Amino acid sequence: MLLCDIGNTTYHFFDENSSYKEDAKLFNPSSIKREVFYICVNSSVKERLSLLDNWIDLSLHVDMSRYYKTMGIDRIMACEAIESGVVVDAGSAITVDIIKNGNFEGGFIYAGVKAMNECYKNISAQLEYSFNFELDLDKMPKNSRDAISYGYLGLLYKEVASYGMKIYLTGGDAGQFSKLFLNSDVDELLLFKGMKNIMKKANLC
């Protein structure tokens, strides 16, 4: 079984033995002859894949009545991976979604680390600091780096922790956020687990 998560810059493949990426501009999807079950947020790639019979779009097998129309398919798959908990996908944007007993309860979107760094930098060169993910949030900051870190990370931490649920971290900055959410589970393959669950529901495997 070959799964693929396609973003704007890469094809991210996963099977039972390995995980690897291909450049979205250079990779030729017709070079793969076996069945590929995929999700895609890249409209031009998705149009190209629609012409290939062995590439199967899993978004067509999602019960969208459980979500909202404009919700990203990558967020949906991460939600499908768990029964209950908070999914924090820390990528270019940070998405936080609540799942209770297999039902999507809602979520919100927060600026990603790089975007927020740029935001502070654009306000003033004096605010160009990396965030301190090991900040003690029980103490008010007494320096600029900790002050911007507290403003950015503290609000997110308190909101996520307030739900009192198990926290699942995924995405490129998950490792950084694991320093903040100490009892969280970091799972870079969470989205693929959701894809497998959709396949089971649709009797595709």
UniProtKB/Swiss-Prot annotation:
Its cofactor is NH4(+); K(+). It is an enzyme of class 2 (transferase). Its EC number is 2.7.1.33. The active site is at residue 74. Its main location: cytoplasm. This is Type III pantothenate kinase. GO terms for biological process: coenzyme A biosynthetic process. Keywords: ATP-binding, Coenzyme A biosynthesis, Cytoplasm, Kinase, Metal-binding, Nucleotide-binding, Potassium, Transferase. The keyword Kinase applies. It is found in: Cytoplasm. Belongs to the type III pantothenate kinase family.
